[in-house]
Amino acid sequence: MAFANFRRILRLPNFEKKRLREYEHVRRDLDPNQVWEIIGELGDGAFGKVYKAKNKETGILAAAKVIETKNEEELEDYMVEIEILATCNHHFIVKLLGSYYWEGKLWIMIEFCPGGAVDAIMLELDRGLKEPEIRTICRQMLEGLTYLHSMKMIHRDLKAGNVLLTLDGDIKLADFGVSAKNVKTLQRRDSFIGTPYWMAPEVVMCETMKDAPYDYKADIWSLGITLIEMAQIEPPHHELNPMRVLLKIAKSEPPTLSSPSKWSPEFHNFLKTALDKNPETRPSAAQLLEHPFVKKVSGNKPLRDLVAEAKAEVLDEIEENGEVEEEEASDTPSSNKSVSQSALGEKDKHTGKEHVGNGIKAEPQNTDSQADIHSQKRNHEGKNYPEHNRHDAVNGKPDIIILNPVSSNHEPKRNSAAESYRNEEHGSAVSSNQRPKSSQSDRQSVELVPNGSFDSPTRYFTGWSKRDSDSGSNSASESMDISMNLSADLSINKETGSLSLRESRLHKKTLKRTRRFVVDGVEVSITTSKIIGDDEKKDEEMRFLRRQELRELRLLQKEEHRNQAQLTSKHSFQMEQMLRRFEQEMNSKRKFYDSELEALERHQKQQIERMEQEHALRRRDEARRIRTEQERDHVKFLEQLKLRKKELKAQVEKLPRQQRRDAMKVQMDDFAQKKHIEEQQFLNKQKEDLTLALRVIVLENRKEIYNKEREFLNKKQQLLRDREAVIWDLEERHLQERHQLVKQQLKDQYFLQRHELLRKHEKEQEQMQRYNQRMMEQLKLRQQQERARLPKNQKAEAKTRMTMFKKSLHISPSGSAAEQREKIKQFSLQEEKRQKAERLQQQQKHEHQLLEMQAECDCNVRDLLQMQNEKCHLLVEHETQKLKTLDEHHIQMIREWRENLRPRKKALEDELEHKKEEQEMFFRMNEEVAGHPFPSNKPAKFYSFSSPEAS
């Protein structure tokens, strides 16, 4: 103790405080760089980067999650993930290969999955998954979830991005960063955590109301949303802001597939069953394993084929459309449009066939060795951004799959491979023995050229490349059918002032992508074509910004979870401290009254012993005094007897001598006999008097002791009453203090919720401001491009119109040359007026667009503020209701406590009265025993009594 004070004075470091907490699965004594070699970067997560690592000894690959921590407290946030990974041992859950904490960085080494995440595969293939693939993934996910839930764990962040694929066609559930490890299977949680689009309604409600916690069935809802995501590339409500989607989930009906006809009834029924807003009726993972949608799934061939397609070699071929020559456009007859497009389509067909043939060595003569299969078209109804829908009309359709056997041994497998890649949307496929038809019409729909341009497109080849899905690369969307009116190529929309479809395609490129891979020994080649433009960059930018928003939300959730955990820990400590103080106060009061009772009993014992000693002395003195008096009386009595004897002798002496002797003898005998009788009677009387006197003394002593015992008993009972009264007061005060503490903790809880909600609202407003600013910038950029293109287009159109006007004058001449020049001059003036009107109309349209966009942005802000105010108001209502319920519960507890206090008081008084009766009965029995002629040797209950003189 002295050394501690000395150390405090000298401000020496406290080594006990710096003692680091040891974790079971985290090594602090080893540099991970000595064991693992970083060979690449896989991605950037919300809390750190993920690297591809290789074990220097075993060569095992791992995904290294490297997280920088500022202090030891942050390290605690990741322990649940490490413990879950270390505890779980299942075929469909990633394994923990090791974890290290070195130089302020936490390294989590996780099993590497070469197939990558499912969402990355969908972006790479630019399509959603087919139903057989979804069935297989769903089956494996359900088995993994069944194991997780049996281990009392909730994933809480199920989505396609957290489902990894191996080369063997198996899935691995990953990312347990926000998972919960429970003590009981049915344990509920109230943390608002996860990714909004995949959140269950009961999890969403926990943002403002903690009264309805959720359990493991929240994962079932996330599973259903993940299946929709895999079918449609994006989850439901993906077009909404991550914060605003929460309100949609809570208030709207469960989502469904956007194209019901594409999917089987079993799939629809499975989603309807899993996406039940009532968690009580929502089935568990084990129950869903018996659903017809996944019950008959056997094997993982669809996933093996999917991974093979995603990991295929890719040849990207970019065709850039040239500018339109104004002179050619004006001089070319309209009848040449179809000719030019047809010729170009035939040329492109041969060009494409040449490159595909070089890539896969196709033999056109062998009709049995190739098949042309149109893969399913991507559904853009739920596309993320409205700009995509504008360009759906210019995307091409053809997807070509060419199957070539690697050797003659694989000839029987051609048909099965073709069947596995049949068109899921239409339910049909071209058989392998059919000759592919000319793709001229399809190519025409893809590679349209502007009217009047006879120049062939410039081609760019990016070459074969190996694409890893886990690298997060995004590919372009598949081609779509188009229908357009070529006669409007040179026109300008009078209503909107926008450029024609032809002009919008002048600066676009056509991407033709060929994927080549092997399935069951059969080499498969898939070719897709699409029109790409600036919107591709916009889509990628919007996707990146959306991921950034989700990352910001994830960071907010993590910090909120940490603050919530700290507050919960603080509240638990406060409650434990208060209960400990209550116990100490109670024990202190009890100890005080127990010591008072002990002191009173000691004083009682001493007092009784002193009284008994005094009584013994008094009885002995009184007995001695009585005996002394009795001895004096006895001497006097003997003296009297002697006098009587002398008198008797004197009387006998008076008799004659002859009678004197006989008379003396008779008289003496008679006197001796009387003397003996009288003396015996006298002694007996003295003895009785002594016994009576001593008995009176004993009774007086006992009465005095009884009074003293009653006095002490009253004092004891008063102490007991005081002790119980103090205990009751303490109990009531403790109930009050406990209520005040719980009430204050509830206020602190809601204060933290309001604080976190305001932080979320600030982040929402910041994101909304960025979104509105981005929309305004895009609109201004588009308007600037339109303004820049308008003069050029007007010039080209004016030249064309002037040429046509001159030709009309030349065909039907009327008037002199001067009149024709005047007409041409008037036509030029009209063209200038028309162009000026077009410019004015465009300016007005742009101003109107800006006003509309500004109004839309303001409306978005108002809607956001209204939604935020509703959340705040709802939170305040919940707090008020919770406080009211808490007060009512406290009043009820006080009422019940007081009702229970009455029988406790009555029981105490009955017990005290019973003790009084026992004491009275005890002394009454002693008095009765004392009334017998023989002395009682029965020991006293309240005091000991011994008198040698009384015996």
UniProtKB/Swiss-Prot annotation:
It comes from Xenopus tropicalis. The modification Phosphoserine is found at residues 483, 487, 491. Its EC number is 2.7.11.1. SUPFAM superfamilies: Protein kinase-like (PK-like). It is an enzyme of class 2 (transferase). It is a peripheral membrane protein. It comes from the Eukaryota. Keywords: ATP-binding, Cell cycle, Cell membrane, Coiled coil, Kinase, Membrane, Nucleotide-binding, Phosphoprotein, Serine/threonine-protein kinase, Transferase. Pfam families: Pkinase (PF00069), PKK (PF12474). Residues 36-294 form the Protein kinase domain. It is found in: Cell membrane. This is Serine/threonine-protein kinase 10. One of its GO terms (biological process) is regulation of lymphocyte migration. Homodimer. May act as a polo kinase kinase by mediating phosphorylation of plk1/plx1 and subsequent activation of plk1/plx1 during oocyte maturation. Residues 331-343, 364-373, 429-443 have a biased composition (Polar residues). Gene3D superfamilies: Phosphorylase Kinase, domain 1 (3.30.200.20), Transferase(Phosphotransferase) domain 1 (1.10.510.10). Residues 583-723, 898-928 form a coiled coil.
